[in-house]
């Protein structure tokens, strides 16, 4: 299962200007906010969560919320993601991989997932 999302960094900057910290809290967990120190990073996190929901085939909504997807970094700074136990079990997900990049005012994320084998 694969999901991809592209977002304008300018769009995220406008979102932050309008909604501030409260807006960030709607889609980022507290530990993610600590990592998201630049608009580029925030845009990448937004794209990652959207790409993850697309890989699951749901989009963000009742089945999968922004806070069901936890983003963090490995010791070298590469992005990683973890699904909530509820979502992981419901969709029978075994593993997830994430890649995020930024270029010319855009952030893009790709998520690949493998289902558990019977």
UniProtKB/Swiss-Prot annotation:
Leader sequence segment: none
Record-listed Mg(2+) binding positions: 5, 50
GO cellular component terms given for this protein: cytoplasm
EC number(s) recorded for this UniProt protein: 2.7.8.7
Claim: Lipid biosynthesis is one of the keywords in the record: yes
Record's catalysed reaction(s): apo-[ACP] + CoA = holo-[ACP] + adenosine 3',5'-bisphosphate + H(+)
Name of the protein described by the UniProt record: Holo-[acyl-carrier-protein] synthase
Biological source species: Wolinella succinogenes (strain ATCC 29543 / DSM 1740 / CCUG 13145 / JCM 31913 / LMG 7466 / NCTC 11488 / FDC 602W) (Vibrio succinogenes)
């Amino acid at each position: 299962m694969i999901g991809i999302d592209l977002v304008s960094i300018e769009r995220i900057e406008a979102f932050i200007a309008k909604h501030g910290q409260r807006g960030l809290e709607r889609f980022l967990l507290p530990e993610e906010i600590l990592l998201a120190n630049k608009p580029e990073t925030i845009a990448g996190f937004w794209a990652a969560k959207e790409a993850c929901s697309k890989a699951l085939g749901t989009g963000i909504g009742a089945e999968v919320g922004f806070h069901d997807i936890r983003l963090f970094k490995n010791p070298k700074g590469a992005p990683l993601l973890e699904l909530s136990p509820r979502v992981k079990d419901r969709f029978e997900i075994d593993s997830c991989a994430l890649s995020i990049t930024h270029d010319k005012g855009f952030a893009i994320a790709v998520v690949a997932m493998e289902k558990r084998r019977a």
